[in-house]
A protein has these predicted regions:
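Basic- and aromatic-enriched surface patches that contact anionic nucleotides/nucleic acids
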Residues: 1-83, 87-90, 134, 164-200, ...
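Alpha-helix capping/termination and helix-coil
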Residues: 63-67, 84, 96-103, 107, ...
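Small-residue-rich helix-loop
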Residues: 75-89, 96, 109-115, 119
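Hydrophobic core segments within long, regular secondary-structure runs in both alpha-
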Residues: 77, 93-100, 137-144
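Short, contiguous acidic/charged loop-to-helix segments that flank catalytic cores in large enzymes
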Residues: 104-111, 166-167
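C-terminal hydrophobic structural anchor segments
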Residues: 112-164, 178-181
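Acidic, carboxylate-rich catalytic segments that either coordinate divalent cations
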Residues: 152-208, 213-219, 223-240
Length: 241
């Protein structure tokens, strides 16, 4: 597939999927289902560019392999090909279906594309509470209103949402922990008898490598294209290589 598509100029997300042949069909099936069509602001361009399929891969990475967190699209797919299994993809598939059934099309202002892997991780923690999925939708609705500016350890949904990065591990950790804390408080989920709900940002070497990437994105946004994304940066890097 990679050889046949050399002249088509596949983007980063599309090329990355060629590194995960075992689960590629499953990933495509999930990305083509109702959550991406109904529960977020659907974009045909994003679908054609493989961005929804990449969101599925990042969700599996976040939910099941966060200790080995990878940032790049190719690195994620390469890792999952060797370390994931069909049960993990089936579980994430179920989570997408349950969120869609609970939220329908009423939470699009919160369930934005850049945060899909974060919300799948938060939902995986919600599932452990045993509450009905409608309660998760109640929380998302509340986050659209009063909770969006509520402070948690110096940050809020609004402040995190303004950050330009989407895959920086420090930012992903902050979002998961902040949104989970807001959810637990709003739904009165008792976590005292369970292990900590917080994920940790313990990969120092990777974190140090992430900062230059964030600077690159910020530089491009400030000096060339204010709408540039991290996927654009990855695509340009691939072209140079």
């Amino acid at each position: 597939v990679r050889k046949l598509n050399v002249q088509r100029g596949m983007n980063t997300s599309q090329r990355a999927l060629t590194w995960i042949p075992t689960y590629a069909r499953k990933i495509k099936n999930i990305a083509d289902e109702g959550f991406f069509k109904n529960s977020i602001e659907y974009s045909d361009t994003a679908r054609k560019n493989g961005e929804y399929m990449q969101s599925v891969c990042r969700s599996v990475m976040n939910v099941f392999h966060f200790d080995d967190y990878k940032r790049g699209a190719k690195e994620i797919c390469d890792y999952l090909e060797d370390n994931s299994n069909i049960e993990e993809f089936n579980t994430v598939h179920e989570y997408f279906q349950r969120i869609e059934a609970a939220c329908k099309d009423t939470c699009k202002d919160i369930l934005v594309k850049k945060d899909i892997p974060v919300w799948l991780t938060v939902f995986s923690k919600f599932v452990k509470s045993g509450l009905q999925d409608s309660k998760f939708a109640d929380f998302i609705h509340e986050l659209s209103g009063k909770l969006r500016s509520k402070d948690v350890n110096g940050v809020s949904y609004d402040s995190l949402n303004k950050e330009s990065g989407t895959t920086d591990k420090k930012l992903v950790v902050a979002k998961i922990n902040t949104y989970t804390a807001l959810m637990n408080e709003f739904l009165h989920i008792d976590t005292t008898e369970t292990s900590s709900t917080e994920v940790e940002n313990d990969n120092t070497e990777e974190n140090e490598q992430e900062n230059p990437e964030e600077t690159t994105l910020s530089f491009v946004q400030e000096n060339a294209n204010p709408d540039a994304t991290e996927e654009d940066i990855e695509f340009y890097r691939d072209m140079v290589e």
